């Protein structure tokens, strides 16, 4: 897995190609359904797709907060305070959850 702060479009393209190669091995009904779901998630136009992307991003932050600070590089300190803000802004609940995760991040940094 490539950290968010190092991921470039070429990495996104590789991941997408690998996913579609795998999906093409499924029976045609499932292949079409999975492709449609993937497209819905990547377009982020539906509420479900927005929630999916927000939760995926928040989960990354929670896991990051669980890691030891010795594994963090300097740019992660700032990124962890702003990452996913744009992905939760459509929901008051997810915005509040993002704030709680940010507070955990700040508490972790202050313990250092």
Language-model features: locations:
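Alpha-helical, largely C-terminal catalytic domains
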Residues: 1-112
């Amino acid at each position: 897995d490539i950290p968010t702060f190092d991921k470039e479009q070429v990495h996104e393209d590789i991941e997408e190609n690998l996913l579609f190669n795998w999906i093409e091995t499924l029976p045609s009904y499932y292949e079409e359904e999975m492709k449609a779901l993937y497209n819905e998630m990547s377009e982020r136009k539906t509420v479900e797709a927005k929630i999916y992307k927000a939760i995926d991003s928040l989960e990354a932050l929670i896991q990051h907060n669980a890691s030891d600070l010795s594994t963090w590089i300097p740019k992660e300190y700032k990124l962890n305070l702003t990452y996913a803000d744009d992905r939760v802004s459509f929901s008051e609940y997810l915005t509040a959850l993002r704030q709680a995760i940010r507070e955990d991040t700040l508490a972790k940094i202050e313990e250092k």
